[in-house]
Structures are given as structure tokens and as C-alpha cells.
Amino acid sequence: MEPLGLVVHGKAEPFSAALRSLVNNPRYSDVCFVVGQERQEVFAHRCLLACRCNFFQRLLGTEPGPGVPSPVVLSTVPTEAFLAVLEFLYTNSVKLYRHSVLEVLTAAVEYGLEELRELCLQFVVKVLDVDLVCEALQVAVTFGLGQLQERCVAFIEAHSQEALRTRGFLELSAAALLPLLRSDKLCVDEAELVRAARSWARVGAAVLERPVAEVAAPVVKELRLALLAPAELSALEEQNRQEPLIPVEQIVEAWKCHALRRGDEARGAPCRRRRGTLPREHHRFLDLSFK
């Protein structure tokens, strides 16, 4: 009886280095991608991509015809991110950078590369900062990455004022902004949050070529106007006449809370203080303080 064989392993580093040398190497390549808005050519090897990734197996499933095959156009993925994907597929390792990791994460999700996705998520959590967090939140909401969304919301809750001043905040979708405005733990006063929401809506209105109030409609209902002092509410009402942002009915409800001096009349959240809410004289009448 023939004895059982034994699998022995050589050194992984030379093998990985040899495969890494094939990334975007036209020598022996049999497929060319045209990548990103810059339409940069990237060279690869069909058999390797197909055996490592179902997305490429489907994309490259048909045999190339005679002659020079046509390039495969992938216009939505940035070149740097695509090269990182190839590096991972060839070597099962990848060098990630803070400035491009969200693009690599997006590609990993779209191509169904779960291991690369997890590596990117771990890296994002390690490098998360004020400038990156809103962009990361947008990616998390777009692709349903629940744990990353929770991490981002918690980070913004702790660094609210700084995060609200970033470009990433102004570029959030309404769906990504909603979990922030619903949070009791934001370390920011409501007056500043109203100003941030207005700035966000103005940017969206300019990009989408729609009225500010229309852009703001999905999110402004989460603003807790009853927390504002009467003078602040009057000023907001006047500004709202000049540049509509908040439905008149919502402002009326805030005035009702002042008139009745009972927080429960606002039915919960509209009168509930956030962690960063500055104290005002009328808050002593509100039943629902921050917990």
C-alpha cells in the first residue's frame, strides 16, 4: 500500500513577489481593461482573475476571438482602486491607503470579494478621522454595511461640530444624514444643527438643480425646533420666509410646545434634548431630557 502523501510548503514571499510582478504587466497578459474616467489601460490574465473572482469569471467567460481582443471597459472604478483589487487577486494581500481605501472597499463590494471587503473595513476603522468619517458613512449606507455605519455614527456623535464642517458632510445623501439627525448623542446644539442642515440642503439644491426645501424635505423633520429659545425660533421663522427650508407646520408645532410648556405635547423626539444641547430657560418645562 502506497504511503499517504504529505503536503509541504515552500516560502510564500518569493511566490507572492513573483505574482505581484505580473500585476498590470503586459507580458503574457491576455486581457486589457480600460479603467476609470482617465481610460487608463490595465493588463491582466484571464485565468487568474476567473479562478479568483466570480465577477470576473462571468465578465471574461467567453473566449476571446482571433486577433487582438477588445479591451474591457470599467469606467466607474478608479485606476488606483482597480490595481489594488488586482494586487489582492494575484497575491491575496494588498497595500491600503487612507485616501483610496473607500474606493477599494466599494470595488470589493461590487465585485463580491468578501475577504478584501473585510480587510478594507478593518483598515477604515483604524484610520477613521473627522475628514474621512462622513465619506465612510456614505459608503456604509449605500452598501448596507451596518457595523461600519454604527462606527461612523458613533464617531460623529463624539466629534459632531468638527464633522459638520467637513465637505463630506455636505455631500451626504439624505439616507446617510437621517441616522445622524435622529441621534440623541450628537455633541452639538440644535441651532448649529439647523445651520448645518441648511448648508447641506443648499449644496444639494445646487447639484440637483432643485429647490432647497425639496432637497431638505426628507431630513428636516428630524430637527428638534422646540429646543430653540423663542427668539431663536422667531429668527428661524423669518429666515424660513426668505429661504424656505422647514415646513411651516413643523415650526407651528415648536411654538405649541412653547405655549403649552409641556414636552409631552411634542410627542417625544421633537422636544428631547441631545447630548450637546445648550441649556435654555424653557427647557425646565420639557419632560424629556437627554438620558
From Swiss-Prot:
Pfam families: BACK (PF07707), BTB (PF00651). InterPro entries: BACK, BTB/POZ_dom, BTBD19, SKP1/BTB/POZ_sf. It comes from the Eukaryota. Residues 134-234 form the BACK domain. Gene3D superfamilies: 1.25.40.420, Potassium Channel Kv1.1, Chain A. Residues 29-98 form the BTB domain. This is BTB/POZ domain-containing protein 19.
